[in-house]
Amino acid sequence: MSRFVQDLSKAMSQDGASQFQEVIRQELELSVKKELEKILTTASSHEFEHTKKDLDGFRKLFHRFLQEKGPSVDWGKIQRPPEDSIQPYEKIKARGLPDNISSVLNKLVVVKLNGGLGTSMGCKGPKSLIGVRNENTFLDLTVQQIEHLNKTYNTDVPLVLMNSFNTDEDTKKILQKYNHCRVKIYTFNQSRYPRINKESLLPVAKDVSYSGENTEAWYPPGHGDIYASFYNSGLLDTFIGEGKEYIFVSNIDNLGATVDLYILNHLMNPPNGKRCEFVMEVTNKTRADVKGGTLTQYEGKLRLVEIAQVPKAHVDEFKSVSKFKIFNTNNLWISLAAVKRLQEQNAIDMEIIVNAKTLDGGLNVIQLETAVGAAIKSFENSLGINVPRSRFLPVKTTSDLLLVMSNLYSLNAGSLTMSEKREFPTVPLVKLGSSFTKVQDYLRRFESIPDMLELDHLTVSGDVTFGKNVSLKGTVIIIANHGDRIDIPPGAVLENKIVSGNLRILDH
């Protein structure tokens, strides 16, 4: 009997604790609602409507954030996806192309995620405006690719840029240079959400402005926001009205994410007659990709699992290249009609990413984000396609930039392809030290980009510069210790070499 009483009192105390937590949650939601209403009153008449949509979207996300506890996946339910749910690209390609490529292409809209700044590479303004090859920017190359398609097949594939409030103004200024290109370019903006104080969980912003003290009070809430923002912009309905059926979504800094006609044909003319609503391009993991999100089978559906969702005890297992062999490239093909249906049903479910930041003044804040690929489980008949590594060529650092600027790649109509002169299809591993982090410093340290056709691995650390016509082969490690400087002379050929110490070349 005493055991029963103990269990009952324990249950009652747990029930009381959960009731208390529920009251706290409701109070907090009410406080946030009041703060958001105060912020909305500071919006001008032309800002009011879209600010209200943004703040309503934030409230929904915040409500979900308060409801969720602990890791969002039950590790025991994670299974490898069934064989037929991830198709090899070779199988898709083997079907060939239809005679009417132009009619298939005319059903497509290309969307590039263009919300990021170039700050990690020491550049101001949108990352898409950084020069990556022969003075062409990411945006230039994208426009060239789509113009080439439209001219070759006499089609009308539009380009849509999802900007953020950080990139919109600068991007729009530059777009006029493409007025004479055969590409219709549209833009829409990601939502703008308020950062919240890590302790109080209340918005840091006091008004809608984005200047002065308020500059750091707002953030774009991750690319998962594309579904709501695209819908709210009116572009979704416009394209459906024009007979478009699919969007191809990718990061603008992934130079491998070109329109693939074989994948598009598979979407438009499926072999089993059943259309896919969502296709995610995945590729094989290497040791460098262990943190990338992977496709799994979860409760009978394909699901993207990110490292942040994995319980700590299973992180090493998640990183295992032998168990989880593929990762998400963020190249996605999505049905427009399905996006419209799910958005109107409020049925797009994406896990919340909680991103902790420290503002310049030292205040700890969190921002709530979502990822576009996480919505795969909300769509019907989803599919993964295991594509060649060449479709994943992101430029996140100057080490990546060195690769794409080199003779490892040739440029044709805005697309980069691996040089036929390279004997192996793999990309060299390049690690440039902190002296090369900023694009400006990086460019100053290379008189010309070295020949890297036979390179396997390059590590550079410290104060190092490269003369013209340098050739790097095999494994090359160059380390200038603190206070030393190494100048690699013009015409030098370094093959399987370690260079250290001090080597100065001065003008006579």
UniProtKB/Swiss-Prot annotation:
Highly expressed in various brain regions. Expressed in amygdala, anterior cingulate cortex, caudate, cerebellar hemisphere, cerebellum, cortex, frontal cortex, hippocampus, hypothalamus, nucleus accumbens, putamen, spinal cord and substantia nigra. Also widely expressed among other tissues, including liver, heart, placenta, lung, kidney, pancreas and skeletal muscle. The modification Phosphothreonine is found at T426. Keywords: Acetylation, Cytoplasm, Disease variant, Epilepsy, Magnesium, Metal-binding, Nucleotidyltransferase, Phosphoprotein, Transferase. UTP binds at L113, N114, G115, G116, K127, Q190, G222, D253, K396. Changing C123S: No significant loss of activity. It catalyses: alpha-D-glucose 1-phosphate + UTP + H(+) = UDP-alpha-D-glucose + diphosphate. Residues 457-508 are annotated as: Oligomerization. Substrate binds at G115, G116, H223, N251, I252, D253, N330. The active site is at K396. It is found in: Cytoplasm. Its EC number is 2.7.7.9. The modification Phosphoserine is found at S13, S434, S448, S461. GO terms for cellular component: cytoplasm; cytosol; extracellular exosome; nucleus. SUPFAM superfamilies: Nucleotide-diphospho-sugar transferases (SSF53448). The modification N6-acetyllysine is found at K438. GO terms for biological process: brain development; glucose 1-phosphate metabolic process; glycogen biosynthetic process; glycogen metabolic process; UDP-alpha-D-glucose metabolic process; UDP-glucuronate biosynthetic process. It is an enzyme of class 2 (transferase). UTP--glucose-1-phosphate uridylyltransferase catalyzing the conversion of glucose-1-phosphate into UDP-glucose, a crucial precursor for the production of glycogen. Homooctamer. Belongs to the UDPGP type 1 family. It is linked to Developmental and epileptic encephalopathy 83: A form of epileptic encephalopathy, a heterogeneous group of severe early-onset epilepsies characterized by refractory seizures, neurodevelopmental impairment, and poor prognosis. Development is normal prior to seizure onset, after which cognitive and motor delays become apparent. DEE83 is an autosomal recessive form characterized by onset of frequent, intractable seizures in the first days to months of life. Affected individuals have profound developmental delay with no motor or language skill acquisition, and poor or absent visual tracking. This is UTP--glucose-1-phosphate uridylyltransferase. The gene is UGP2.
